[in-house]
Amino acid sequence: MSYLVCGMIEYLMEQRSDIEADLKSIGYEVGIKLLELCNFEREVRISTLLYRATFDLLSLVSDSDRRVEKARDVDRTYLLTDSDGLFSRFISVPDEWNGLSADSIVCGMIQAALMASGYDSEVTAFPEPSENLPNRVIFQIRILDL
């Protein structure tokens, strides 16, 4: 799957479009199909929904250490930390596209799970490498309506 996403990113870079928005929309479509594969049911509680999206849905794409937590300062915002982002691991971004996160496709998958349960959301991927975790990605999940 990483090879496919790498090809999509290369194509989108040639088009000079909004790559992250395009990756999110592609991820949304992939997420809908993955929801069908894992028999995803509508969840009412946001904490249960985020848990299932993180450990049931995303485990179909990659198997890495993940953690979900509520943001301390901001209301209706959650942080999903992926210690080894699948697409960040295999795709290197040129220097001129420094802020680009190849894991934006996962944002669309998370949004699909939230939308399937009736939650409108905005998900953003931030690469946060550290010395021990060079491919760590933090997904900021903002619930727009409750």
Swiss-Prot record:
A GO term from the CC aspect: TRAPPI protein complex
Domain of life where this protein originates: Eukaryota
CDD domains: TRAPPC5_Trs31 (cd14943)
Broad class of where this protein is predominantly found: Golgi
UniProt KW keywords: Endoplasmic reticulum, ER-Golgi transport, Golgi apparatus, Transport
Record GO biological process: endoplasmic reticulum to Golgi vesicle-mediated transport
SUPFAM superfamilies, per the entry: Ligand-binding domain in the NO signalling and Golgi transport
Subcellular location: Golgi apparatus, cis-Golgi network; Endoplasmic reticulum
Its job: May play a role in vesicular transport from endoplasmic reticulum to Golgi.
Protein family: Belongs to the TRAPP small subunits family. BET3 subfamily.
Subunit structure: Part of the multisubunit TRAPP (transport protein particle) complex.
Name of the molecule in the record: Putative trafficking protein particle complex subunit TRS31
Organism: Encephalitozoon cuniculi (strain GB-M1) (Microsporidian parasite)
Name of the coding gene: TRS31
